[in-house]
Amino acid sequence: MTFSKQLFPFVFFLLFLVSLRHASNPNNCSSSSSRPLRCGPLEVPIRFPFCNHARFNLHCTDLNKTVLELPMSGTFLVRDIDYRRQKIYINDPNCLAKRLLTFNISGSPFSPHFDILYTFLSCPNEVVLPSWYPSIPCLSNSTSSFFATSNYSLAQSMLPSCQIVKRLHVPATSPFGETRFSSDLNNQSLLLEWALPDCRAKCLGATKKTGTIYNSNIFSCSFSFLYDSRELFINGNLSSGVLVLVISLSAVTVFVFPTCIAIRLYDSERFDSAIAAATVMQQPREVMARRGLDQSTIETFKKMELGESRRLSGTNGIVCPICLSEYASKETVRFIPECDHCFHVECIDVWLKIHGSCPLCRNSCA
């Protein structure tokens, strides 16, 4: 019998007692017992579930700014977090409109609170437009100007002089769309919410920090899930907490010890071999999930050299959704099978070698 098997019941028992101790301590969940974590003096407080939770990726930048990392869209500046309503406001001060063209919250625990459908257009600069049609400066260039509106009728009225680049859903802060072109899209925040884990039924305080938060490290703080302290100390009644503790210790004696003895008698070789087999079976799936396409497969996708008109089939616009540059004549574009979305060859080839799916609709190309 190995030393680890002999040690396991003792460690299990200690962890159980420690859990009871933290569950019966009402100060562990008190937001006033310690100062909340922050990236900087004026930044938002960091509390559960943004403390040491795998899917809530909150970081500090070198400038002590709080940023949220979304798996499919990158990092965004955090403007505010409403813990009671479980909402977070994010923004990109550089060019939010550009980030929206490829915005995707797949793989994250967040969802839009208000979902507004916006239309993005590109108009040649030689087209004379009214002065009250504000363009988006960070997307515009010397040859064309970009516009955005949630009024689709207004967008259609600008055709055929202008081209619709993309229509997409924006997680807005208000359920009401605009009747004109958006003049401050870059100054707005995106409003996201999360349903699980539900922090509203728990206290909001974080009790412990490891690492140095002001050196751009990831947050790590503890939070007790085992019990709510209010269940153990109702109206200051200490006897109920003691009663729960006594019952729990009795349960340890009756149920936990026999279980530990059974585990110690379990065949270690069968246990280890089962774990090894599970590990071997799991590794190929993880590798395959991260694998892109090889060049020979990518070359089988249809290519086309653009003519002077630069016209493309289907819903494809005149702008490459990856690099956001307008297509030029004599350039070569590649089409994705099934969805028929197209991109610059040099843009989509690099993407497919990493992701193996369409950047717009996420359909698998394998």
Swiss-Prot record:
<keyword id="KW-0472">Membrane</keyword>
<dbReference type="InterPro" id="IPR025287">
    <property type="entry name" value="WAK_GUB"/>
</dbReference>
<keyword id="KW-1133">Transmembrane helix</keyword>
<dbReference type="InterPro" id="IPR013083">
    <property type="entry name" value="Znf_RING/FYVE/PHD"/>
</dbReference>
<keyword id="KW-0479">Metal-binding</keyword>
<keyword id="KW-0808">Transferase</keyword>
<dbReference type="GO" id="GO:0016740">
    <property type="term" value="F:transferase activity"/>
</dbReference>
<protein>
    <recommendedName>
        <fullName>Putative RING-H2 finger protein ATL21C</fullName>
        <ecNumber>2.3.2.27</ecNumber>
    </recommendedName>
</protein>
<keyword id="KW-0862">Zinc</keyword>
<dbReference type="GO" id="GO:0016567">
    <property type="term" value="P:protein ubiquitination"/>
</dbReference>
<keyword id="KW-0863">Zinc-finger</keyword>
<feature type="signal peptide">
    <location>
        <begin position="1"/>
        <end position="23"/>
    </location>
</feature>
<comment type="pathway">
    <text>Protein modification; protein ubiquitination.</text>
</comment>
<dbReference type="InterPro" id="IPR046948">
    <property type="entry name" value="ATL20-22-like"/>
</dbReference>
<feature type="zinc finger region" description="RING-type; atypical">
    <location>
        <begin position="320"/>
        <end position="362"/>
    </location>
</feature>
<dbReference type="GO" id="GO:0008270">
    <property type="term" value="F:zinc ion binding"/>
</dbReference>
<dbReference type="Pfam" id="PF13639">
    <property type="entry name" value="zf-RING_2"/>
</dbReference>
<keyword id="KW-0812">Transmembrane</keyword>
<feature type="transmembrane region" description="Helical">
    <location>
        <begin position="243"/>
        <end position="263"/>
    </location>
</feature>
<dbReference type="Pfam" id="PF13947">
    <property type="entry name" value="GUB_WAK_bind"/>
</dbReference>
<dbReference type="GO" id="GO:0030247">
    <property type="term" value="F:polysaccharide binding"/>
</dbReference>
<dbReference type="InterPro" id="IPR001841">
    <property type="entry name" value="Znf_RING"/>
</dbReference>
<dbReference type="GO" id="GO:0016020">
    <property type="term" value="C:membrane"/>
</dbReference>
<keyword id="KW-0833">Ubl conjugation pathway</keyword>
<comment type="similarity">
    <text>Belongs to the RING-type zinc finger family. ATL subfamily.</text>
</comment>
<keyword id="KW-0732">Signal</keyword>
